[in-house]
Curated annotation (Swiss-Prot):
InterPro entries: Fork_head_dom, FOXG1, TF_fork_head_CS_1, TF_fork_head_CS_2, WH-like_DNA-bd_sf, WH_DNA-bd_sf
Native organism: Caenorhabditis elegans
DNA-binding region: 93-188
Reported phenotype of the disruption mutant: RNAi-mediated knockdown by injection into adults causes slow and spatially restricted movement of about 30% of their L1 larval progeny, which nonetheless grow normally and do not display any obvious phenotype as late larvae or adults. However, simultaneous knockdown of forkhead gene pes-1 causes 12% of eggs produced by hermaphrodites to arrest development at late stages of embryogenesis and 81% arrest after hatching as L1 stage larvae.
GO biological process: anatomical structure morphogenesis; cell differentiation; dendrite development; embryo development ending in birth or egg hatching; nematode larval development; neuron fate specification; non-motile cilium assembly; positive regulation of transcription by RNA polymerase II
Segments of skewed composition (Basic and acidic residues): 66-75
Biased composition (Low complexity): 36-54, 76-91
Any GO CC annotation of this UniProt entry: nucleus
Entry function: Transcription factor. Plays a role in embryogenesis and later development, perhaps acting redundantly with forkhead protein pes-1.
Region feature (Disordered): 32-94
CDD domains per UniProt: FH_FOXG
An example molecular function term from Gene Ontology annotations: RNA polymerase II cis-regulatory region sequence-specific DNA binding
Protein name: Forkhead box protein fkh-2
Gene name as annotated: fkh-2
Length: 270
């Protein structure tokens, strides 16, 4: 029996099917080529590279701009400071207090003493500002000489001709007092004895500090007792409060250890 097919009844469908198959075969290489072009790593890398290089190029420009702005900003304060900083003129006011000027005048003198007129002459000679600006600075010099304990008045000898007394530096001020570089004022550095007293007071209390002479740490005042108040309202002089016994006496070995440590300092001070 012969085979029967639907294509025998409709030959037109066969021709259309053949045409569709041929068209499908002809378009398949183009699709493959496009897919290979899209999936080709070289082309994708090139596109990303161009994008990345463009991005890096833009970023480098931004960096250069930022660096230029930073350099300008960093240079601007220095340039402004250089423009603001003008060379100091000798006629400008010196950055020293009157006490510092007096101290410099006395120290620079050959005999380490000067009269009031000699101090004036030193200041006017070394600092022309006071020569041209006479606005009461001489009165300030006199007041500082009389009020500051660093300066001592020394009477003139009978065989020394001239007028006025001499002014010298106190013996303790020569080593302990100095001129501050930042403020231009007199500063007092702590002596070895005062440092030792303060160290003893901080570590062991007032009892250990009293071992050093001329040291009286501030003691809190005791409350006033009722019997100290008179009936008529007259308040007698308050009694000196007795300091509480520090804990250092409860440990004699601790106090003895501290005294042994300070023995070398005691020998130097004697």
């Amino acid at each position: 029996m012969a085979r029967f097919s639907i294509l025998d009844l409709c030959p037109d469908l066969v021709e259309e099917a053949v045409k569709i198959e041929q068209l499908h075969i002809s378009t398949q290489p183009c699709i493959k080529q496009e897919s290979t072009d899209i999936s080709d790593p070289s082309t994708s890398i090139d596109t990303t590279d161009t994008m990345s290089t463009d991005y890096l190029h833009d970023e480098s420009i931004d960096d250069e701009r930022s660096e230029s702005t930073l350099s300008k900003d960093s240079k601007s304060p220095s340039s402004s400071n250089s423009e603001e900083k003008t060379p100091s003129s000798p006629n400008d006011k010196p950055p020293f207090s009157y006490n510092a000027l007096i101290m410099m005048a006395i120290k620079d003198s050959p005999e380490k003493r000067l009269t009031l007129a000699g101090i004036y002459e030193y200041i006017v000679t070394n600092y022309p500002f006071y020569r041209d600006n006479k606005q009461g600075w001489q009165n300030s010099i006199r007041h500082n000489l009389s009020l500051n304990k660093c300066f001592v008045k020394v009477p003139r000898n009978f065989d020394d001709p001239g007028k006025g007394n001499y002014w010298m530096l106190d013996a303790t001020a020569e080593d302990e007092v100095f001129i501050g570089g930042a403020t231009g004022k007199l500063r007092r550095r702590p002596s070895s004895l005062s440092r030792a007293r303060m160290d003893a007071y901080k570590q062991y209390g007032a009892a250990a500090a009293n071992l050093f002479p001329y040291f009286s740490p501030g003691m809190p005042a005791l409350p006033r007792h009722p019997y100290l108040t008179a009936p008529n309202g007259f308040l007698p002089r308050q009694m000196m409060p007795i300091p509480a016994m520090p804990q250092v006496f409860a440990q004699p070995e601790l106090l003895q250890l501290y005294i042994n440590q300070q023995q070398s300092l005691f020998t130097k001070l004697q």
